[in-house]
Amino acid sequence: MNKNNIVSAGLLIIGDEILSGRTVDQNINFLAKNLSENGILLREVRVVGDFENEIIFAVNELRKKFDYVFTSGGIGPTHDDITSLSIAKAFNQDLILNEVAHKILIQHYGAENINEARLKMAYLPRKASLLDNPISSAPGFRIENVFVMAGIPKIFQAMFEASKKELKIGCKISARELKISLTESVIAKDLTDLQSQYHEISMGSYPFENGTSLVFRGFDKEILEEAFLKMQNLITKIDPKIIIEIL
């Protein structure tokens, strides 16, 4: 597999509420699965608090490393919602009143109900393009390879669905799984030896109660099946009865 064909992404989760433990993130799993379905690998997830400099630093690092960056959180009306301003500064752009976003807010709340806090949500980086948000009025946006979205899972998911048409499709990854009633330590050496033969295949070992799940992932399905069969044969030689499930 040519590495130039691999499309990668990073996720930046923004919010003190995540770091304090008050809120449990529900967006990582959704994003990872949906990106994978489009042949895009989620390669890194970072969490930062509501600090402008930290957001700017993280966004600038991630957008240089990956094809796409998704952010969640911090685009609401309160004083600690500083994502839009931070993204603007990361791109050296002014934060301006986006007329389209402003009209959306007026349609949602009514012109007489647009106070300073709500108007704040219409201020976006100068070159931002809006992401559709059919759930609420808070606008998400895209600027270059960065997609800025809400932290609330239902809204995050809706914004992602709206952004999918703008993503390039990568080479989809295949996966196989072997569940066995052995501890990791028993098969660790065999797995290490096999991994050294197949550098293009990701081999993971994940313990559960009374067993281990071996997960093989790769872009080349033929090579993946070859490596997986070798592992299966190694386990069978130990004792075929220890195989719980093959997926």
Predicted regions and their residues:
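Glycine-rich phosphate/diphosphate-binding loop of Rossmann-like nucleotide-binding domains
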Residues: N2-V45, D50, E225
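An accessory alpha-helical subdomain
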Residues: N145-T236
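Short proline/glycine- and acidic-rich turn/helix-capping motifs at secondary-structure junctions
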Residues: S181-S185, I242-L247
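Proline/glycine-rich low-complexity loops and linkers
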Residues: E54-F57, K64, I82-K168
